C-alpha cells in the first residue's frame, strides 16, 4: 500500500499550529488580565502649563531640540542636525546666544542659529557639561580615558586652561560626568557620577570641599545660603557644608509622579525647587499616560507646577529648564582669576 510520506510532517505541523494558537491565546488573555501601568502623573497638573513661566528648555532627546517659551508659546526653536549625541547641558546667555554641550562637542550659536564657535570632542571622548564665562570663554569637562577640564577662549580659539580630572573608570567614558557649575566664589562644583560624589575644585585643581555619599550624582548647584543642591536617580537633596542633609526629596514624596530619573534640579529665587524628569530618549511616549517633564516643588514638598507638553508642542525629554521670568546674566561667573 502506498504511504503518504507527507502525512507525518502535516500532522506535526497541525499540532504545532494548535500549540502556537493556544499559547498566543493564553498570552493575549494574560496581557488582558495584566493590570495597567499606573499613570506617570496626575491627569490634571497644578499650575498654568506652558504659561506658568517663560523659560528656555533643552533635553537629552534623540532629536536634540531646544526651545524658548514665552507667554505660553514657543517663540524660538532649534534642532541640532549633526545626527548624533544628546544635549546634556545648555545655557541661554543674556545676549541671546545659546551654549550647549551635545555629547560629541560644545557649540555656541546666535539667536538666528548661526554657529559662532564649536569644539568637537576627540574620538572616544564625550562632553556633557559646559558653562559660559562671560561672552568670550567656556569651561567644560571632557569625558574619556584621560578626562580633563578645559577653559576655551572663543576669540583666540585656544585653550587657556587644561586640568586632569579623576574618575572611577577610565574605560567607561559615558558615565563619568554629567554636570558641573561654577560658584560665586569662583570654584568649580563637579558631580562625579561614576564615583558617587561631589567635589569642589579651585583654579589650581585643589579639592576645597567634597561629599562622598552622592549616589548617581547627576547635577549640582551651590545655593545662596552656602548649602549645596544635589540630584540624581530619584533623589534631590540639600546638604550643608558638613555634608549633612537638611532637605530631601524622594520618590516617596511624589506618589502621584513617576520620577525615577531626575537630571538637573535648580533652586529658584522664590525658594522652590525645579526638578527635571528625564524619559528614555529612544522610546515613545503615550500622551494619554505621559509623565510630567518637570515639576516645581515648595520647601514643604507641594507640587505647584507641572509641565507636560508631549504634543503641540512636543518639547521632548527634559534635562534643563532655565526660567526667564526675570532678566539675568548667567554668564556673569568666574573660575578663580579667569573672568
Question: Where are each of the predicted segments found?
Answer:
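Sec/Tat signal peptide C-region and signal peptidase I cleavage site
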Residues: 25-26
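Histidine-/acidic-rich catalytic cores in large beta-rich domains
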Residues: 29-339
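Bacterial N-terminal signal peptides
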Residues: 12-22
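Bacterial N-terminal signal peptides that target proteins for export
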Residues: 2-14
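A general, composition-driven signal for non-globular sequence regions
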Residues: 2, 20-22, 42, 91
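Alpha-helical and His/Cys-centered functional microenvironments
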Residues: 6, 17-18, 32
Amino acid at each position: 500500500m502506498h504511504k503518504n510520506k507527507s502525512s507525518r510532517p502535516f500532522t506535526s505541523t497541525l499540532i504545532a499550529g494548535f500549540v502556537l494558537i493556544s499559547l498566543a491565546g493564553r498570552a493575549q488573555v494574560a496581557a488582558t488580565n495584566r493590570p495597567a501601568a499606573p499613570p506617570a502623573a496626575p491627569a490634571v497638573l497644578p499650575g498654568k502649563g506652558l504659561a506658568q513661566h517663560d523659560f528656555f528648555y533643552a533635553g537629552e532627546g534623540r532629536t536634540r531640540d531646544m526651545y524658548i517659551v514665552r507667554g505660553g508659546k514657543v517663540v524660538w526653536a532649534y534642532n541640532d542636525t549633526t545626527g548624533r549625541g544628546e544635549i546634556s547641558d545648555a545655557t541661554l546667555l543674556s545676549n541671546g546666544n545659546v551654549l550647549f554641550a551635545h555629547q560629541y562637542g560644545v557649540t555656541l550659536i546666535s539667536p538666528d542659529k548661526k554657529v559662532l564657535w564649536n569644539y568637537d570632542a576627540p574620538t572616544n571622548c564625550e562632553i556633557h557639561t559646559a558653562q559660559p564665562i562671560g561672552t568670550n570663554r567656556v569651561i567644560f569637562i571632557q569625558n574619556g580615558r584621560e578626562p580633563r577640564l578645559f577653559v576655551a577662549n572663543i576669540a583666540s580659539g585656544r585653550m587657556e586652561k587644561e586640568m586632569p580630572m579623576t574618575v572611577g573608570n577610565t574605560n567607561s567614558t559615558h558615565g563619568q560626568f554629567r554636570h558641573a557649575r561654577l560658584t560665586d566664589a569662583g570654584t568649580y562644583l563637579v558631580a562625579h557620577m561614576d564615583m558617587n560624589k561631589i567635589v569642589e575644585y579651585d583654579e589650581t585643581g585643589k579639592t576645597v570641599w567634597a561629599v562622598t555619599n552622592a549616589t548617581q550624582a547627576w547635577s549640582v548647584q551651590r545655593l545662596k545660603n552656602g548649602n549645596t543642591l544635589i540630584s540624581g536617580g530619584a533623589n534631590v537633596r540639600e546638604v550643608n557644608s558638613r555634608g549633612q542633609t537638611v532637605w530631601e526629596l524622594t520618590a516617596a514624596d511624589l506618589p502621584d509622579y513617576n520620577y525615577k530619573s531626575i537630571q538637573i534640579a535648580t533652586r529658584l529665587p522664590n525658594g522652590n525647587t525645579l526638578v527635571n524628569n528625564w524619559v528614555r530618549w529612544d522610546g515613545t511616549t503615550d500622551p494619554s499616560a505621559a509623565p510630567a517633564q518637570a515639576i516645581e516643588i515648595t520647601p514643604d514638598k507641594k507640587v505647584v507646577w507641572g509641565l507636560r507638553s508631549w504634543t503641540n508642542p512636543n518639547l521632548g525629554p527634559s534635562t534643563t529648564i532655565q526660567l526667564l521670568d526675570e532678566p539675568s546674566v548667567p554668564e556673569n561667573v568666574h573660575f578663580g582669576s579667569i573672568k
